[in-house]
Swiss-Prot record:
Keywords associated with the record: ATP-binding, Cytoplasm, DNA damage, DNA repair, DNA replication, DNA-binding, Nucleotide-binding, SOS response
Family: Belongs to the RecF family.
Pfam families in alphabetical order: SMC_N
Record's protein name: DNA replication and repair protein RecF
Binding residues annotated for ATP, in chain numbering: 30-37
Amino acid sequence: MHISRLALDHYRSWSQVVVDFVPGVNILFGKNGLGKTNLVEAVEVLSTGSSHRTSSTLPLIERGQTTATIRANVADDAGQTTTYEASIHARGANRARINSGSSLYLRDIIGKIPSVSFTPEDQRLVSGDPGARRTMMNQAAALLEPGYMQTLQQFTRIAKQRATLLKQLNANANNGQPMDAVLSGLEIWTGQFIEAGVVLTRMRAHVISLLAEPFAAIYADLAGAGEQVTLTYAPSFDEVLMFNDPHPQISEHFQRIYPGEVARGVNLIGPQRDDMNLDLAGIPAREFASNGEMWTMALALKMALFEIVRDRLGLQPIVILDDVFAQLDDSRRAQILDFARKQDQVLITVAAEGDVPDYESAHRIDVAALAEPASVILPTLGNLSDLRENESLGKYDGKTAVDSASVERKVS
């Protein structure tokens, strides 16, 4: 499986761009600020429904616009091409289409184009705050757990409503206003919060259990003989790991922390506070592991995710190496390059073409050239949103819109 063509419309810095990829290694090179990362991030969003760079969809949309569109032609091993389209909205639900068909939710196409991204921020999976690790859990579970994104979206909506009621209770208490109606509403939303939270927690627990063994094995292979690593789940609803039916215990927990929640106006427990533990020799790695050990753990974690997604979905994920080579020493650079050579498709971004060792068969894309207005404007190109009227991306009146390294971009 590989992406043969990617088209973006009002996505971050790109007003309009169409770029061709090939099976194997694709190297996107160019100075920082040209939009290399935005191109491969769009693949990540189409694949997982989210970006590791932001928890909000608003930054994904070009300034001054209300919608960003991502389209990709994806060729399977049998040579069949399918067009996937995602529409990212500043307001309202994000939508998707397959082969210009009926409108779907974005979550309905997650996993159709599996990908695993390696980024400069990966070290934060070990050293950073829990938010980075939750983002990875969400992206992994979106690929591996059917219905996960729908459950996550439902939980997020419930959590926001419950937090609003907690703030209202605090305000009513301070102003001497009645609280009975708000308390009744809080009880209802707390029940829904627990129900959705337990489902979410169990899904995440399953994903972490899948990753734990290959993570340890891959780390040992990368690092050689030495300390052992472990990966465990640290749910806020730890009752889920202790009881078959944890609802009563979680409800009691909420009763104990009720005063604190009202005082602060936030949900003090729940999946929004989950974490995962990465330990080296039985000690939290973030507390004492070296920079090199943290990078090796991060690489092992992403490689383990690749392995599990490949084995469970029966598809070879697209590998994204986004500006990682400057962060790695020679040994780890060689390890990740050896891993990349074995994959169906790899998208590599670098600041300079020489930053990555030579691949004889690599398809090289000069991002600076992509950013330049085309010398010839095809009269039938129009807005990229019109592409769905054609049989596939890149077909305009029977002509190919762009060749392997060219692009059409309209700069506003």
